[in-house]
């Protein structure tokens, strides 16, 4: 990792400010070949993290831009290496010329995620923090950003490390008793082992219990829109999206497949799924769409059951209602409140009933309130919510192995058998933070990053 890398950290689109990011042994001195301080002093004379004005030159020595730069010396930098940033005006041409000048000065193009990979390999962060960097970049709500920021600061690592370290101590003591039976080593009672391992299993269970809310905070609440044809499902999707995402006509069966759109509803990130109207049909394509509608209700966080409030309920409405009631949560939406009503809300078996008019855009504040009640902000988004499927899978494997170790203890199995389970648990838990590192896992993680991060 001693080679010098460089990248445009802000992308190649026109922006107000563009940043060239550099890292590696000797990068500060090499950067001084293309960026010269107005003071005439070398770039390496700057104190850490102090912006200074200067001029960026291209590979032929021609001035490109008047800009700012700062340096950070190892190990007190993002990557743990000597680093520098040159902040220019965001001209793609100027940034490209500056990058080519850096290549001529001995830098190479950074690979996607290479700055953060170096931070991980140099011990500046663990894998949970590295993955949280991506989550922070992708965050679409304040809650998602706050939770990711907490994980960048090490919230998950602070929960995992004490458990892992406790298992290391148990393994070491177990090995000592097994390997040196004649030594005067304080024996660790079986009940002591069992209590310790059971406590750590409970801690992992508590961490896993945050997965559902963590997924909804980071990726969105999956809300499937169900109803009979022409109830206003697609109109609801369009109104919440703020634009015409799907075609709306008076012809039943216009929507024949699921259509997804992510929207923000108050503090909630919601992944809306519009579905085909549920009815009996001889049209082969529409029938496939209806079947998908029924299946979608089983794979969501909440069903939004849309009814045309201006007409009495039909058998098609009741069939759609049955599908909605199979969802984990459901909200009945009485659409077309701009017309005289024909449905009595008290006849509907729903805890949440929201009257709206997609035509007049009324009642959507009530829909937001229903989401607030169904998905309360009852857990702090401080980084403690588990949002990452890879991490959750590894924690679940660790829990299964430690539970197996407890069962082995209770069954009177030999210490060697217990150790097999415990060391398997350690391997799995170590994958969460990267203490037990697999190259295929780290490659997959850092491939998700953009160039310059």
Describe each model-derived feature in a short phrase.
Residues 53-64, 69-73, 253-281, 299:
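Switch I (G2) and immediately adjacent beta-strands of P-loop GTPase domains
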Residues 1-146, 150, 154, 331:
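A glycine-rich (often HGG/GG-containing) alpha/beta subdomain
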Residues 286-310:
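Inter-motif core of Ras-like GTPase G domains
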Residues 272, 306, 333:
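Generic enzyme active-site microenvironment
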Residues 12, 62, 76, 126, ...:
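Conserved catalytic network of the ASCE P-loop NTPase/AAA+ motor domain
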Residues 3-8, 12, 142-264, 281-283, ...:
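C-terminal-of-GTPase-core extension/linker across diverse P-loop GTPases
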Residues 22, 88-90, 240, 275, ...:
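Glycine-rich, N-terminal phosphate-binding loop of Rossmann-like dinucleotide-binding domains
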Residues 278, 286-290, 318:
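Short alpha-helix of the ABC ATPase nucleotide-binding domain corresponding to the H-loop/switch region
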């Amino acid at each position: 990792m001693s080679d010098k890398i460089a990248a445009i950290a802000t992308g190649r689109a026109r922006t107000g400010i563009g940043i060239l990011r550099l890292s590696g042994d000797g990068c500060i001195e090499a950067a001084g070949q293309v960026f010269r301080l107005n003071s005439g002093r070398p770039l390496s004379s700057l104190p850490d993290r102090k912006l200074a004005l200067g001029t960026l030159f291209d590979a032929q020595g021609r001035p490109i831009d008047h800009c700012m730069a700062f340096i950070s010396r190892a190990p007190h930098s993002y990557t743990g290496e000597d680093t520098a940033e040159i902040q220019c005006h965001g001209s793609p041409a100027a940034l490209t010329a500056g990058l080519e000048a850096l290549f001529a000065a001995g830098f190479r193009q950074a690979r996607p995620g290479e700055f953060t990979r170096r931070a991980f390999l140099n011990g500046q962060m663990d894998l949970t923090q590295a993955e949280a960097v991506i989550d922070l970049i992708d965050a679409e709500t304040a809650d998602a950003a706050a939770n990711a920021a907490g994980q960048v600061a090490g919230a998950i690592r602070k929960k995992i490390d004490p458990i892992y370290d406790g298992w290391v101590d148990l393994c070491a003591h177990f090995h000592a008793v097994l390997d040196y039976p004649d030594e005067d080593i304080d024996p660790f009672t079986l009940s002591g082992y069992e209590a310790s391992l059971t406590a750590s299993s409970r801690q992992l269970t508590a961490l896993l219990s945050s997965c559902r809310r963590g997924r909804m905070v980071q990726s969105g609440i999956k809300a499937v829109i169900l109803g009979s044809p022409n109830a206003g499902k697609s109109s609801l999707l369009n109104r919440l999206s703020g634009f015409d995402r799907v075609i709306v006509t008076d012809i039943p069966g216009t929507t024949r497949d699921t259509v997804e759109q992510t929207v923000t509803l108050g503090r909630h990130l919601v992944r809306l799924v519009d579905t085909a109207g549920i009815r009996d049909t001889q049209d082969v394509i529409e029938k496939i769409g209806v079947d998908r509608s029924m299946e979608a209700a089983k794979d969501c966080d909440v069903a939004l059951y849309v009814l045309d409030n201006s007409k009495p309920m039909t058998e098609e409405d009741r069939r759609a209602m049955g599908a909605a009631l199979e969802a984990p949560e459901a909200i009945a939406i009485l659409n077309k409140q701009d017309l005289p009503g024909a449905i009595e809300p008290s006849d509907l078996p729903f805890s949440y009933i929201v009257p709206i008019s997609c035509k007049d855009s009324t009642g959507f504040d009530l829909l937001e309130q229903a989401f607030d009640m169904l998905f309360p902000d009852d857990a702090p988004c401080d980084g403690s919510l588990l949002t990452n499927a890879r991490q959750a899978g590894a924690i679940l494997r660790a829990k299964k192995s430690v539970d197996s170790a407890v069962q082995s203890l209770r069954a009177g199995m030999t210490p060697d058998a217990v150790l097999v389970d415990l060391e398997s648990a350690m391997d799995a838990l170590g994958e969460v933070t990267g203490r037990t590192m697999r190259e295929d896992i780290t490659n997959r993680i850092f491939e998700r990053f953009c160039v310059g991060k």
